Structure formats: C-alpha cells, structure tokens
Amino acid sequence: MKKILFYIIIFVIICFGIPILFTNKKDNTKEVSTIQENVQSNEQNEIKEYDYKQYNKIKLLHKQSTQVEEIPLDEYLYGVVSAEMPASFEKEALKAQAIVARTYTIYKIQNAKKHEEADICDDSTCCQAWISKEDRLAKWEESARQSNWEKIVDAVDSTKGKIITYEGKPINAFFHSNSGGKTETTVNVWGGSGYPYLQSVSTSGEEAYTQYKSEVTLNKQTFIDKIKEKHNEFEIDFGTQDCIKILEYTDGERVKKIKVGNLELSGVEIRTILGLKSANFEVIMDESDNITFKVKGYGHGVGMSQTGADSMAKQGSNFEEIIKHFYTGVEIQNI
C-alpha cells in the first residue's frame, strides 16, 4: 500500500511539477531577452545621436558644379561661419554662429536631408551658405586675411563638438540676419505645428546695423504687374479708401495678413512677391504714382538674429547666453 502511494506521489510530481518548472523558466528567459533588446536599442540611439566620430566627415554638394565633396566637419564649418557671418563680428557671436551651424548640419543629416547623394549643400536658400578658404581669403583685404581667418577657426575649434539640444535632441537651428527688434515663430512664417524652442523674443541694439532698415518704392503699375504674376485675378482701385490695408500682425510684429485690392495675402507672400527684406513693413501711399514699403529687419526672422547676437556680445554676453536667448528652453551639449 505504501509502495502504491509512493508511486502515485511520484506520478503527480512528474505530471504537474515539470511543466510548471519549464513554464517559469521560459517566461523568465523572455523577460530578460526583452530587457536586453531595449537596452541595446537605447544604446544604438545614443550612438546615432551623439557619437561625434559619426560626423567627422560630411558629404557636401556644390550646387553650381553639382560635384559632391567629402570633407571634415570642422573644415566645412569654417566655410559656413565665414560665409554666413562677418569676421568683424564679436568672437562670442562667431562662436554662437559656429554652434548654430554645427547643430543645423547635424539636424539636417538626421532629419531633413534634401539630397540623396550628399548630406548638405552650399546653397543658402536650400541649406547653408559655404565658401572655400581660398575664395574667402581672396574677398578679404590682404591686411585682414590672417586675423579674420584665425577668428573663424577659433570660433569653430573652441566650440568643438557643441550642439544645441531640446529634450536631448538636436534642434532645427534657424538663423537670420536682423530681426528688426523681435524674432518670429516658425508657424507665422512657414505654418505647420512649429517648434517649442523657436519663440518670438525681443532683441536690442539691432538698429545700429545697416540691415535694420530698408525701403522699396514701386510705381503703381509695377506693383500691379508683380502681384498679377502670382495672382492673375488681382484687381485694385487706388481711388478707394483702404485699397491696401494691414489686417493683422504676428507675435514678432510682422505683417500676418494684408488686404491688397480684392485679395487677402500673408505678409510673407507679399515679401516674396515684392522682394522685401522682411515681412515687418509698413505701406505708404502718397499723392504721386508710387507705393513705398518701409521695412525693418532682414530675413525670415526665425531663430538667432546674427546682428542681435553681435549686439549681445558687445554688451558682454557669451555664446551660451546668446544661444539661450534666441532658442527657448534649450541646452548646449557635446556630441
């Protein structure tokens, strides 16, 4: 009887115990495997985003020749900074420009490549302006060539590896020449949902620069012809009151909406059609045959103002203070 009972117990253990044992082992193995995959995935993301060696060299498309050249990143940045910002600007402004250019380059490579065969091009209307050392030196006065180039190289080298991040990721670091006293949000320029770090901020000292003010005067027929090129249905009666009227302004004090005859257009479109330097303008119609646009600022107005950066540097701000003024809630990190 005891023997029978013993074998029954053994049989029960074999039938129920072993499956339970293997089931637990299988679940534990799966759990560990999942954790390892997640860790590996995170490590790969970190390497992709922050391994500086990955960006030691870039492929640069020369738009005019259509040739693609592979060059060291820092050498490329020398060409960008020297093409985009005057060497006469303050050192801290040049450093800020170097970090902005580096960030913009890496953001483009990771998120917004426009060229299949290259990382970025040398056309400022598409990517960033770039100029070779030889061409840049040739355009400077001989007496200033060495000192100017040394300032450019120092701006890039002294900020080596530094980029601007928002929540740990490289930002889309837009910049422009002169904000006219206040920068703009991306939503008011290009639409879309915008970026939280590209908000409208005030900038002092820009009125001292030649880019701050400009004027465009057109006779009425030229004005009509230019708008009709884009909008064939355009009609206007200059004898009526408010035939041209600004309807709404943006946070950055630019024209958001403007009534022009029978059309309602954005300030950005009027800027493009008429070749204005900014969408921050006022319209003056006198008794003559002319229409004058008085413009403040130069460029789209989004991100860092270059003259604003130089003005801040002259007032004692360093590159970090400049960057954090123009880009809201960002950090400067090493890649």
Regions found by a protein language model. Give the residues of each.
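Sec-exported extracytoplasmic/periplasmic mature domains
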Residues: S82-P86, I99-N111, G161, K228, ...
